[in-house]
């Protein structure tokens, strides 16, 4: 599959990499739309700690897609469902996570930030993202492009509330 990967400051490449394998508790998502964020630009221009030629990172944390494959232990979600995601996955046990504020977790992981993101044909959705409710089903009247910007729109909305 094709993926846009960061290899360091000002070093971003479109490369062919294997489609991610999933386990029985994960989901494989086929990317339909992904938005470019200021964070992606900053990482491209400045690089990211831990990302280099030996440890590249697939960018993209604002995205939507269709479920391609579902692990046998995953409840509710089915192949063909259209979803978008909240990109931050908290540890699930700290006070912030218990309060539902995963984005404030000191040990959070995030698609396209410190784990492979959606500037690729496919994205692996790990079990903790499935369990913690990071996926949201897209209604039929919302396009993938519109769904991909739900996350940045929610950031703006939360800034006003």
Tell me what each language-model feature is.
Residues 1-2:
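Extreme N-terminal starter segment of soluble prokaryotic enzymes
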Residues 39-45:
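Cytochrome P450 core scaffold surrounding the K-helix E-X-X-R motif
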Residues 7, 18-19, 54-60, 111-117, ...:
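Short Gly/Pro-enriched turn/cap motifs at secondary-structure boundaries
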Residues 20-34, 48-98, 136-139:
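Glycine-rich beta-strand-centered segment in the early N-terminal region that forms part
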């Amino acid at each position: 599959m094709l993926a846009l990967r960061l290899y360091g400051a000002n070093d971003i490449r479109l490369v062919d990499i294997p489609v991610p394998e999933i386990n029985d508790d994960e989901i494989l998502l086929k990317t339909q739309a992904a938005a470019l964020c200021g964070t992606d630009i900053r990482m491209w221009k400045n690089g990211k700690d831990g990302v280099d030629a030996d440890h590249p990172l697939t960018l993209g944390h604002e995205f939507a897609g269709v479920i391609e494959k579902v692990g046998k232990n995953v409840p509710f979600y089915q192949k063909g469902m259209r979803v978008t995601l909240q990109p931050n996955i908290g540890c699930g046990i700290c006070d912030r996570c218990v309060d539902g504020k995963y984005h404030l977790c000191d040990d959070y992981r995030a698609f396209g930030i410190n784990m492979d993101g959606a500037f690729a044909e496919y994205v692996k959705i790990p079990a903790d993202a499935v369990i913690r409710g990071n996926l949201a089903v897209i209604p039929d009247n919302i396009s993938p492009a519109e769904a991909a910007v739900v996350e940045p729109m929610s950031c703006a909305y939360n800034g006003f509330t």
